[in-house]
């Protein structure tokens, strides 16, 4: 079995693949993971056992990380506690044409999502929108040319900034508001968060020009599922992209 990990700024998303099927998924807050390799190794083994994953069957480990200061400890933990050399996805491990951008600045999660989207929809121009800590937009042409896109604060990050910057405002649960015009502070905030982000999503898609097939992923993609912005929502896009990159590089002996 192949274990893949998407290490984001807010959450760690772990997937266990048996062939091309995800048989287990685990989510933890990134802040819950200690930074030493031993602590991380113990944490990972315990998390997998708690989710009934047979550690003896894991024979590969693929990682997408946008938390560089944890990469060394994570890699060391996998080697020591799983006896596996981990594969880290990067600009050097993909056949995406990234010549149009500063490739070294592109996050591993964005690369993984593009790889997965291309595999699912070959010969299409694609727009991948990842609604996580940040909301990112990535354009990829049908001939696998990565054009990048844009980045804006995510829904939760916007809420946190609002509450930290305005002393009389407190946090709210993030849900689609029942009405656009709020009747108290909480419903005002919910309305602003939802419709403000929705407006930014619509305008960004519009500004990217010619018709593209639009795929959403990330923790807040489902918040906008009733809107007509996306052609599809793919929660496992990054995990599947890590798997594809792992297998392709394994064939090359990387």
Curated annotation (Swiss-Prot):
Q: Say which family it is in.
A: Belongs to the type III pantothenate kinase family.
Task: Specify which residues bind substrate according to the UniProt entry for this protein.
Answer: 107-110, 185
Read off the Pfam families from this record.
Pan_kinase
What is the protein named? Type III pantothenate kinase 2
Q: How does it assemble?
A: Homodimer.
Q: One GO CC term of this entry?
A: cytoplasm
Q: What organism does this protein naturally occur in?
A: Francisella tularensis subsp. holarctica (strain LVS)
Biological processes, Gene Ontology terms = coenzyme A biosynthetic process
Q: Where in the cell is it found?
A: Cytoplasm
Entry's Gene Ontology molecular function annotations: ATP binding; metal ion binding; pantothenate kinase activity
């Amino acid at each position: 079995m192949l274990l893949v990990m998407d290490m984001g700024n807010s959450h760690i998303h772990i997937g266990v693949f048996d062939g091309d099927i995800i048989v287990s998924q685990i989510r933890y807050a990134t802040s819950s993971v200690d930074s030493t390799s031993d602590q991380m190794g113990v944490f990972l083994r315990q998390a997998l056992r708690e989710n009934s994953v047979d550690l003896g069957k894991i024979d590969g480990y693929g990682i997408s990380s946008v938390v560089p200061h944890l990469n060394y400890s994570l890699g060391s933990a996998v080697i020591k506690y799983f006896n596996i050399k981990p594969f880290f996805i990067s600009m050097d491990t993909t056949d995406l044409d990234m010549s149009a951008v500063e490739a070294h600045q592109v996050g591993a999660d964005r690369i993984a999502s593009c790889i997965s989207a291309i595999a699912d929809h070959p010969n299409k121009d694609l727009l991948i929108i990842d609604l996580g800590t940040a909301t990112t937009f990535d354009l990829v042409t049908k001939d696998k040319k990565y054009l990048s896109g844009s980045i804006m604060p995510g829904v939760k990050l916007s809420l946190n900034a609002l509450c930290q910057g305005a002393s009389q405002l407190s946090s709210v649960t993030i849900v689609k508001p029942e009405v656009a015009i709020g009747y108290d502070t909480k419903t005002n905030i919910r309305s602003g968060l939802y419709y403000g982000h929705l407006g930014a999503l619509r305008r960004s898609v519009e500004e990217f020009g010619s018709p593209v097939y639009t795929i959403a992923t990330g923790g807040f993609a489902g918040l906008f599922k009733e809107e007509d912005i996306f052609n599809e929502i793919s929660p496992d896009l990054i995990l599947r992209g890590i798997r594809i990159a792992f297998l392709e590089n394994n064939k090359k002996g990387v």
